[in-house]
Amino acid sequence: MSEIRLGLVVTEFNREITYAMEELAVQHAKDLGAKVVERVLVPGSFEVPLAVRKLLERDDIDAVVTLGAIIKGDTDHDQAIAQQAFRKIQDLMVEYGKPVALGISGPGMTRMEALERVHYAKRAVEAAVKMVRRLRELEGE
């Protein structure tokens, strides 16, 4: 079975959190025998789907991992952003037939809760790698 090639889409909003997630994801991909071939930084979670689409269009990307932290503010804006972004990410995964792992934590979190969930980046990488392997098995590779 050939090496699994991942693309990362990482939000710049709450960068101190997403930077830690990004570094953890890259290392965990290596530990699992996968390789991150492209990293794309986007301003926030709302912009994630467009970058996901661009990576899914590439032949050298087997799966995409999204990383971000949607923290609760004074309004319900975090809920609206998350709902729209998550739905579009799922739609893109089905449209392109390639795994897209959701490593965006939130909404409704405090900054402290987001920091406590940095390790969720590893779960997202694991999900992407597992799905690529399962799809390859289904396709007889």
Curated annotation (Swiss-Prot):
Species of the source: Methanopyrus kandleri (strain AV19 / DSM 6324 / JCM 9639 / NBRC 100938)
Protein name: 6,7-dimethyl-8-ribityllumazine synthase
The protein's Enzyme Commission number: 2.5.1.78
UniProt-annotated binding residues for (2S)-2-hydroxy-3-oxobutyl phosphate: 74-75, 117
Function according to Swiss-Prot or TrEMBL: Catalyzes the formation of 6,7-dimethyl-8-ribityllumazine by condensation of 5-amino-6-(D-ribitylamino)uracil with 3,4-dihydroxy-2-butanone 4-phosphate. This is the penultimate step in the biosynthesis of riboflavin.
GO biological process: riboflavin biosynthetic process
Family that this chain belongs to: Belongs to the DMRL synthase family.
Residues reported to bind 5-amino-6-(D-ribitylamino)uracil: 13, 45-47, 69-71, 102
List of catalytic residues: 77
UniProt keyword annotations, A-Z: Riboflavin biosynthesis, Transferase
Catalytic activity: (2S)-2-hydroxy-3-oxobutyl phosphate + 5-amino-6-(D-ribitylamino)uracil = 6,7-dimethyl-8-(1-D-ribityl)lumazine + phosphate + 2 H2O + H(+)
